[in-house]
A protein has these predicted regions:
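Exposed alpha-helical structural elements
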Residues: 25, 44, 95-99
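A short, surface-exposed loop/turn module that caps and links secondary-structure elements
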Residues: 35-64
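Intrinsically disordered, low-complexity regions enriched in polar/acidic and amide residues
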Residues: 21-24, 39, 101
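Residue-level marker for the onset of beta-strands and adjacent loop->beta junctions
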Residues: 1, 59, 70-72
């Protein structure tokens, strides 16, 4: 089941930090995953997150763009079939998980 991808206000700011070519790649990846954003353990394309360095990220999933060095963290709002993008950031250590933890509270 396809979900509607929605960027949070913070994620809209995040994506502007990338150049136009990178923005197209990020948008394309989000659109691809939005076709089936469920966690992989439910047959979807999302990589589920759990506890990362003491941060409870249960219920969140990630998309990894290896060549760009970018992680996209999102949560599903199943009742509305919405895939809400919380963070779009470089894969600098686990910084993206720190940001996701703060924004998800």
């Amino acid at each position: 089941m396809s979900y509607k991808a929605k960027l949070s206000d913070d994620a809209k700011k995040d994506i502007k930090e990338f150049n136009p070519a990178q923005q197209r790649q990020i948008t394309s990846a989000i659109q691809k995953v939005s076709i089936n954003p469920l966690p992989q353990n439910e047959g979807g394309l999302g990589k589920p997150l759990g506890n990362k360095q003491g941060k409870n990220l249960t219920g969140l999933c990630k998309i990894v763009l290896m060549k760009l060095g970018v992680r996209i963290v999102y949560k599903l709002i199943r009742t509305e079939t919405v895939m809400e993008i919380i963070v779009i950031a470089a894969r600098a250590d686990d910084e993206v998980y720190d940001i996701a933890n703060k924004r998800n509270q």
